[in-house]
């Protein structure tokens, strides 16, 4: 939807993205961080598309940490393009209609090869997802802040992490089921530690 903003603002955003890629690429190499871009690239200037692709190729072998940047991205677009991909496979006869399920959809969605989103931080005082990562953030914890993105500090990021750590993630289960699962996990871990002679603090 951001393509609907004034042309001058869109052009400025594209320029800033190009500058950011140039400035940050050496840091990506230094810290071995992969860089990837998700979204519909059809409306992005060709020169910037080429720059994005080059950055992805240069950092493709860095898989321990990946920085994913959404450009021209929308959650509904993402699900539609995933559905088209699967529909094409069905039409081509390489996928049976009965095989289309959540797992297949996950494989076709953007970031499908990465774990689901655990924490989604929304800056700028807006209390909505704005069509962002609708599939990937299905079970994400949400953190909203009035702080604008350029002023979002490491201290506030740590605060978001701290609040995230206090939340109980149930994934459809009851609180009692979660606690029972945690107790079972702790008991199993203690038993394994005792058997191996290890101690944990």
Q: What label would you give each PLM region?
A:
Residues 1-201:
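Flexible, compositionally biased loop and terminal segments
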């Amino acid at each position: 939807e951001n393509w609907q903003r004034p042309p001058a603002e869109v052009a400025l955003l594209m320029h800033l993205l190009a500058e950011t890629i140039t400035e940050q690429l050496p840091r990506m190499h230094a810290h071995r961080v992969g860089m990837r871009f998700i979204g519909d690239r059809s409306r992005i200037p060709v020169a910037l598309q080429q720059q994005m692709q080059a950055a992805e190729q240069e950092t493709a072998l860095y898989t321990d940490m990946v920085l994913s940047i959404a450009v021209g991205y929308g959650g509904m677009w993402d699900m539609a393009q995933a559905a088209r991909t699967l529909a094409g496979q069905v039409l081509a006869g390489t996928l049976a209609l009965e095989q289309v399920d959540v797992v297949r959809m996950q494989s076709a969605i953007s970031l499908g090869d990465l774990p689901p989103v655990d924490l989604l931080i929304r800056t700028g005082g807006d209390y909505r997802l704005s069509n962002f990562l609708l599939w990937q953030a299905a079970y994400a914890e949400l953190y909203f802040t009035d702080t604008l993105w350029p002023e979002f500090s490491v201290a506030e990021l740590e605060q978001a992490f701290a609040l995230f750590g206090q939340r109980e993630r149930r994934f459809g289960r009851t609180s009692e089921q979660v606690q029972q699962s945690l107790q079972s996990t702790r008991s199993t871990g203690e038993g394994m530690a005792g058997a191996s002679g290890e101690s944990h603090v």
